[in-house]
Protein backbone atom coordinates (compact mmCIF):
# COMPACT_ATOMS: atom_id res chain seq x y z
CA UNK A 1 0.00 0.00 0.00
CA UNK A 2 1.40 3.35 -1.00
CA UNK A 3 1.79 5.82 1.85
CA UNK A 4 -0.13 9.09 1.67
CA UNK A 5 1.93 12.24 1.08
CA UNK A 6 2.69 14.29 4.16
CA UNK A 7 0.53 17.38 4.76
CA UNK A 8 3.62 19.55 4.17
CA UNK A 9 4.31 17.97 0.75
CA UNK A 10 0.66 18.09 -0.19
CA UNK A 11 0.52 21.77 0.73
CA UNK A 12 3.63 22.53 -1.30
CA UNK A 13 2.17 20.74 -4.31
CA UNK A 14 -1.07 22.70 -3.99
CA UNK A 15 0.83 26.00 -3.83
CA UNK A 16 2.79 25.04 -6.95
CA UNK A 17 -0.45 24.37 -8.79
CA UNK A 18 -2.06 27.60 -7.64
CA UNK A 19 0.97 29.86 -8.28
CA UNK A 20 0.22 30.47 -11.99
CA UNK A 21 -3.41 31.16 -11.15
CA UNK A 22 -2.39 33.64 -8.46
CA UNK A 23 -0.15 35.44 -10.94
CA UNK A 24 -3.04 35.68 -13.40
CA UNK A 25 -5.42 36.85 -10.69
CA UNK A 26 -3.15 39.80 -9.98
CA UNK A 27 -3.58 41.08 -13.54
CA UNK A 28 -6.01 43.96 -13.87
CA UNK A 29 -9.35 42.63 -15.06
CA UNK A 30 -10.84 43.95 -17.25
CA UNK A 31 -7.60 45.23 -18.85
CA UNK A 32 -6.98 48.95 -18.42
CA UNK A 33 -6.13 51.11 -21.43
CA UNK A 34 -3.06 53.29 -20.85
CA UNK A 35 -2.00 56.09 -23.22
CA UNK A 36 1.77 56.08 -23.14
CA UNK A 37 4.36 58.37 -24.75
CA UNK A 38 8.10 57.73 -25.03
CA UNK A 39 10.47 60.69 -25.32
CA UNK A 40 12.20 59.39 -28.48
CA UNK A 41 12.57 56.05 -30.27
CA UNK A 42 15.91 54.68 -29.12
CA UNK A 43 17.66 51.43 -28.25
CA UNK A 44 18.30 53.21 -24.94
CA UNK A 45 14.83 52.00 -23.92
CA UNK A 46 15.29 48.28 -24.61
CA UNK A 47 13.64 47.08 -21.34
CA UNK A 48 10.43 48.87 -22.30
CA UNK A 49 10.35 47.40 -25.82
CA UNK A 50 10.99 43.93 -24.40
CA UNK A 51 8.09 44.40 -21.99
CA UNK A 52 5.83 45.38 -24.88
CA UNK A 53 6.91 42.69 -27.34
CA UNK A 54 7.04 39.84 -24.81
CA UNK A 55 3.59 40.55 -23.42
CA UNK A 56 4.61 41.74 -19.94
CA UNK A 57 2.09 44.59 -20.02
CA UNK A 58 -0.63 42.27 -21.30
CA UNK A 59 0.20 39.81 -18.51
CA UNK A 60 -0.37 42.62 -16.01
CA UNK A 61 -3.73 43.60 -17.51
CA UNK A 62 -2.46 46.75 -19.20
CA UNK A 63 -3.58 47.61 -22.74
CA UNK A 64 -0.85 50.05 -23.83
CA UNK A 65 -0.97 52.39 -26.81
CA UNK A 66 2.37 54.10 -27.57
CA UNK A 67 3.35 57.38 -29.22
CA UNK A 68 6.76 59.05 -29.56
CA UNK A 69 6.91 62.63 -28.23
CA UNK A 70 10.23 63.72 -29.80
CA UNK A 71 11.44 65.46 -26.66
CA UNK A 72 10.96 65.60 -22.89
CA UNK A 73 9.33 69.02 -23.21
CA UNK A 74 6.71 67.63 -25.60
CA UNK A 75 6.19 64.56 -23.43
CA UNK A 76 5.54 66.72 -20.39
CA UNK A 77 3.12 68.86 -22.40
CA UNK A 78 1.19 65.72 -23.35
CA UNK A 79 1.05 64.67 -19.70
CA UNK A 80 -0.08 68.04 -18.36
CA UNK A 81 -2.66 68.50 -21.11
CA UNK A 82 -4.18 65.09 -20.40
CA UNK A 83 -3.43 63.52 -23.79
CA UNK A 84 -1.10 60.95 -22.17
CA UNK A 85 -1.47 58.94 -18.95
CA UNK A 86 2.16 57.87 -18.50
CA UNK A 87 5.27 59.28 -20.17
CA UNK A 88 8.93 58.28 -20.30
CA UNK A 89 10.91 61.51 -20.01
CA UNK A 90 13.85 63.10 -18.22
CA UNK A 91 13.40 63.67 -14.46
CA UNK A 92 14.46 67.30 -14.78
CA UNK A 93 11.07 68.15 -16.30
CA UNK A 94 9.22 67.17 -13.12
CA UNK A 95 11.53 69.40 -11.08
CA UNK A 96 10.87 72.35 -13.40
CA UNK A 97 7.08 71.88 -13.24
CA UNK A 98 7.19 71.46 -9.46
CA UNK A 99 8.64 74.98 -9.31
CA UNK A 100 6.10 76.38 -11.77
CA UNK A 101 2.57 77.68 -11.26
CA UNK A 102 1.06 74.69 -13.05
CA UNK A 103 -1.89 73.34 -11.02
CA UNK A 104 -1.11 69.87 -12.37
CA UNK A 105 1.99 68.31 -10.82
CA UNK A 106 3.88 65.34 -12.29
CA UNK A 107 5.36 62.60 -10.14
CA UNK A 108 8.12 60.17 -11.03
CA UNK A 109 7.23 56.61 -9.99
CA UNK A 110 9.80 54.37 -11.73
CA UNK A 111 13.20 54.69 -13.41
CA UNK A 112 14.39 53.00 -16.60
CA UNK A 113 17.91 54.23 -17.37
CA UNK A 114 20.63 54.54 -14.74
CA UNK A 115 22.48 57.31 -16.57
CA UNK A 116 22.85 59.17 -19.87
CA UNK A 117 22.85 56.99 -22.99
CA UNK A 118 24.45 59.52 -25.35
CA UNK A 119 27.84 58.87 -26.93
CA UNK A 120 30.28 61.59 -27.93
CA UNK A 121 31.28 61.26 -31.57
CA UNK A 122 34.27 62.80 -33.35
CA UNK A 123 34.51 63.34 -37.09
CA UNK A 124 37.94 61.77 -37.32
CA UNK A 125 39.51 58.79 -35.53
CA UNK A 126 41.11 59.77 -32.21
CA UNK A 127 43.91 57.53 -30.97
CA UNK A 128 43.75 58.65 -27.36
CA UNK A 129 40.77 60.87 -26.60
CA UNK A 130 40.94 63.53 -23.93
CA UNK A 131 38.06 65.87 -23.13
CA UNK A 132 40.42 68.85 -23.39
CA UNK A 133 40.41 68.18 -27.15
CA UNK A 134 36.95 69.79 -27.23
CA UNK A 135 38.33 73.20 -26.31
CA UNK A 136 37.71 75.65 -29.13
CA UNK A 137 35.56 73.11 -31.00
CA UNK A 138 31.97 73.16 -32.23
CA UNK A 139 29.91 70.46 -30.49
CA UNK A 140 26.35 69.42 -31.34
CA UNK A 141 24.60 69.43 -27.99
CA UNK A 142 20.90 69.39 -27.20
CA UNK A 143 17.97 71.62 -26.26
CA UNK A 144 18.86 74.14 -23.49
CA UNK A 145 17.71 72.90 -20.07
CA UNK A 146 17.41 69.30 -21.26
CA UNK A 147 19.03 66.34 -19.54
CA UNK A 148 21.29 65.50 -22.52
CA UNK A 149 22.83 68.97 -22.40
CA UNK A 150 23.06 69.07 -18.60
CA UNK A 151 24.85 65.70 -18.54
CA UNK A 152 27.21 66.77 -21.35
CA UNK A 153 28.05 69.99 -19.51
CA UNK A 154 28.64 68.00 -16.31
CA UNK A 155 31.08 65.70 -18.14
CA UNK A 156 32.88 68.72 -19.61
CA UNK A 157 33.24 70.43 -16.23
CA UNK A 158 34.45 67.18 -14.67
CA UNK A 159 37.37 67.27 -17.10
CA UNK A 160 38.18 70.95 -16.67
CA UNK A 161 36.36 72.20 -19.77
CA UNK A 162 34.05 75.21 -19.27
CA UNK A 163 30.94 74.53 -21.39
CA UNK A 164 30.18 78.25 -21.62
CA UNK A 165 33.63 79.52 -22.54
CA UNK A 166 35.79 76.70 -23.89
CA UNK A 167 33.45 75.12 -26.47
CA UNK A 168 30.75 76.25 -28.88
CA UNK A 169 27.67 74.15 -28.13
CA UNK A 170 25.08 73.89 -30.92
CA UNK A 171 21.84 73.51 -28.98
CA UNK A 172 19.25 74.75 -31.47
CA UNK A 173 18.92 71.69 -33.72
CA UNK A 174 15.63 69.77 -33.52
CA UNK A 175 15.78 66.10 -32.52
CA UNK A 176 14.77 64.68 -35.94
CA UNK A 177 17.34 66.92 -37.69
CA UNK A 178 20.40 66.20 -35.55
CA UNK A 179 21.91 63.34 -37.58
CA UNK A 180 21.22 65.21 -40.81
CA UNK A 181 22.95 68.32 -39.47
CA UNK A 182 25.99 66.23 -38.56
CA UNK A 183 26.02 64.60 -42.01
CA UNK A 184 25.82 68.08 -43.56
CA UNK A 185 29.00 69.09 -41.76
CA UNK A 186 27.79 70.86 -38.63
CA UNK A 187 29.90 70.30 -35.52
CA UNK A 188 33.34 68.81 -35.02
CA UNK A 189 31.99 66.66 -32.19
CA UNK A 190 28.43 65.72 -31.27
CA UNK A 191 26.37 63.62 -28.87
CA UNK A 192 24.10 60.90 -30.27
CA UNK A 193 21.94 58.07 -28.92
CA UNK A 194 21.73 54.60 -30.34
CA UNK A 195 20.77 53.69 -33.00
CA UNK A 196 21.95 56.96 -34.59
CA UNK A 197 25.42 56.78 -33.04
CA UNK A 198 26.07 53.29 -34.38
CA UNK A 199 24.67 54.14 -37.82
CA UNK A 200 26.99 57.14 -38.16
CA UNK A 201 29.96 54.98 -37.16
CA UNK A 202 29.07 52.19 -39.60
CA UNK A 203 28.70 54.72 -42.42
CA UNK A 204 32.13 56.15 -41.68
CA UNK A 205 30.62 59.48 -40.63
CA UNK A 206 31.78 59.46 -37.02
CA UNK A 207 33.81 57.73 -34.34
CA UNK A 208 32.65 57.08 -30.77
CA UNK A 209 35.21 58.54 -28.36
CA UNK A 210 33.32 58.58 -25.03
CA UNK A 211 30.15 57.65 -23.14
CA UNK A 212 28.68 60.75 -21.48
CA UNK A 213 26.84 58.64 -18.89
CA UNK A 214 29.99 56.72 -17.99
CA UNK A 215 31.77 60.01 -17.28
CA UNK A 216 28.95 61.44 -15.16
CA UNK A 217 28.11 58.29 -13.19
CA UNK A 218 24.83 56.74 -12.04
CA UNK A 219 22.20 59.48 -12.07
CA UNK A 220 18.67 58.62 -13.21
CA UNK A 221 18.23 59.78 -16.79
CA UNK A 222 14.82 58.66 -18.07
CA UNK A 223 11.89 57.93 -15.80
CA UNK A 224 8.25 56.92 -15.96
CA UNK A 225 6.08 59.82 -14.91
CA UNK A 226 2.37 60.46 -14.36
CA UNK A 227 0.35 63.27 -12.81
CA UNK A 228 -0.25 63.17 -9.08
CA UNK A 229 -3.99 62.88 -9.77
CA UNK A 230 -3.57 59.91 -12.12
CA UNK A 231 -1.42 58.13 -9.54
CA UNK A 232 -3.97 58.80 -6.77
CA UNK A 233 -6.86 57.64 -8.94
CA UNK A 234 -5.09 54.61 -10.44
CA UNK A 235 -2.70 53.08 -7.87
CA UNK A 236 -3.26 49.55 -9.20
CA UNK A 237 -2.31 50.66 -12.71
CA UNK A 238 0.86 52.35 -11.45
CA UNK A 239 1.84 49.31 -9.38
CA UNK A 240 1.20 46.97 -12.30
CA UNK A 241 3.28 49.21 -14.59
CA UNK A 242 6.13 49.35 -12.08
CA UNK A 243 6.04 45.57 -11.63
CA UNK A 244 6.39 45.22 -15.41
CA UNK A 245 9.35 47.62 -15.45
CA UNK A 246 11.08 45.68 -12.65
CA UNK A 247 10.50 42.39 -14.48
CA UNK A 248 11.86 43.80 -17.77
CA UNK A 249 14.90 45.40 -16.13
CA UNK A 250 15.88 42.13 -14.48
CA UNK A 251 15.36 40.20 -17.71
CA UNK A 252 17.52 42.60 -19.74
CA UNK A 253 20.31 42.43 -17.15
CA UNK A 254 20.31 38.62 -17.28
CA UNK A 255 19.88 38.15 -21.04
CA UNK A 256 22.53 38.29 -23.80
CA UNK A 257 22.22 41.06 -26.38
CA UNK A 258 21.81 38.56 -29.22
CA UNK A 259 18.71 37.15 -27.50
CA UNK A 260 17.22 40.59 -26.86
CA UNK A 261 17.69 41.81 -30.43
CA UNK A 262 14.91 39.83 -32.19
CA UNK A 263 12.54 40.77 -29.37
CA UNK A 264 12.78 44.50 -30.16
CA UNK A 265 13.27 44.52 -33.95
CA UNK A 266 9.61 45.37 -34.57
CA UNK A 267 10.36 48.82 -33.09
CA UNK A 268 13.36 49.36 -35.37
CA UNK A 269 12.18 48.32 -38.84
CA UNK A 270 14.84 48.39 -41.50
CA UNK A 271 17.72 48.15 -39.07
CA UNK A 272 20.30 45.40 -39.35
CA UNK A 273 20.03 42.89 -36.49
CA UNK A 274 23.79 42.79 -36.02
CA UNK A 275 23.80 46.58 -35.63
CA UNK A 276 21.07 46.42 -32.98
CA UNK A 277 22.95 43.71 -31.09
CA UNK A 278 26.10 45.85 -31.17
CA UNK A 279 24.18 48.83 -29.77
CA UNK A 280 22.68 46.74 -26.95
CA UNK A 281 26.12 45.36 -26.08
CA UNK A 282 27.51 48.88 -25.96
CA UNK A 283 24.81 49.98 -23.51
CA UNK A 284 25.34 46.87 -21.41
CA UNK A 285 29.07 47.60 -21.29
CA UNK A 286 28.45 51.01 -19.76
CA UNK A 287 25.69 49.75 -17.39
CA UNK A 288 23.15 52.18 -18.78
CA UNK A 289 20.04 50.28 -17.62
CA UNK A 290 18.77 50.24 -14.06
CA UNK A 291 18.60 47.01 -12.08
CA UNK A 292 15.64 48.28 -10.08
CA UNK A 293 12.93 50.87 -10.88
CA UNK A 294 13.58 52.75 -7.63
CA UNK A 295 14.65 56.39 -8.13
CA UNK A 296 16.62 57.32 -5.02
CA UNK A 297 16.83 60.58 -3.12
CA UNK A 298 20.61 60.58 -3.63
CA UNK A 299 20.23 60.45 -7.41
CA UNK A 300 17.73 63.31 -7.41
CA UNK A 301 20.00 65.41 -5.20
CA UNK A 302 22.89 64.83 -7.58
CA UNK A 303 20.71 65.71 -10.57
CA UNK A 304 19.66 68.98 -8.95
CA UNK A 305 23.33 69.75 -8.19
CA UNK A 306 23.94 69.36 -11.93
CA UNK A 307 20.97 71.55 -12.88
CA UNK A 308 22.23 74.31 -10.58
CA UNK A 309 25.80 74.01 -11.91
CA UNK A 310 24.45 74.31 -15.47
CA UNK A 311 22.54 77.46 -14.44
CA UNK A 312 19.18 76.11 -15.58
CA UNK A 313 17.85 76.20 -12.02
CA UNK A 314 18.53 78.39 -9.01
CA UNK A 315 19.84 76.74 -5.87
CA UNK A 316 16.83 78.12 -3.99
CA UNK A 317 14.48 76.32 -6.40
CA UNK A 318 15.48 72.80 -5.39
CA UNK A 319 12.49 70.49 -5.09
CA UNK A 320 11.96 68.07 -2.22
CA UNK A 321 12.41 64.42 -3.17
CA UNK A 322 8.97 63.44 -1.89
CA UNK A 323 7.35 66.23 -3.95
CA UNK A 324 8.82 64.88 -7.19
CA UNK A 325 9.16 61.12 -6.62
CA UNK A 326 6.66 58.64 -5.23
CA UNK A 327 8.82 55.64 -4.37
CA UNK A 328 6.27 53.28 -2.80
CA UNK A 329 5.46 51.45 -6.03
CA UNK A 330 9.11 50.79 -6.92
CA UNK A 331 9.87 49.59 -3.38
CA UNK A 332 7.00 47.10 -3.57
CA UNK A 333 8.14 45.94 -7.01
CA UNK A 334 11.67 45.04 -5.89
How should these model regions be labeled?
Residues 1-11:
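Bacterial N-terminal signal peptides that target proteins for export
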Residues 11-20:
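Bacterial N-terminal signal peptides
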Residues 21-25:
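Sec/Tat signal peptide C-region and signal peptidase I cleavage site
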Residues 26-164, 168-174, 181, 188-194, ...:
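Short, glycine-/small- and polar/acidic-enriched structural segments
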Residues 49, 95, 153, 198, ...:
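Predominant activation on well-ordered alpha-helical scaffold segments within soluble catalytic domains
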Residues 93, 124, 176-268:
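Pocket-lining segment of extracytoplasmic ligand-binding domains
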Residues 232-314:
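Secondary-structure end/capping motifs
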Residues 304-334:
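Conserved C-terminal helix/tail region of periplasmic/extracytoplasmic solute-binding proteins
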Amino acid sequence: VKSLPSPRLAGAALLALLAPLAAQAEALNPPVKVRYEEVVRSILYVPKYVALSQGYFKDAGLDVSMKTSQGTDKGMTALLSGSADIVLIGPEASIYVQNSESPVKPRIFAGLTATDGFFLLARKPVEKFDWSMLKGKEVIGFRPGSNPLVFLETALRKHGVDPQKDVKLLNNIGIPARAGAWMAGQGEYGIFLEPEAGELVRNGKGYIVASVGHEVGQVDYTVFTATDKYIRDNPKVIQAWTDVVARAEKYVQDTPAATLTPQIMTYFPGMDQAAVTEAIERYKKYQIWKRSPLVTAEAMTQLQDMLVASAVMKDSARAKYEDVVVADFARKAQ
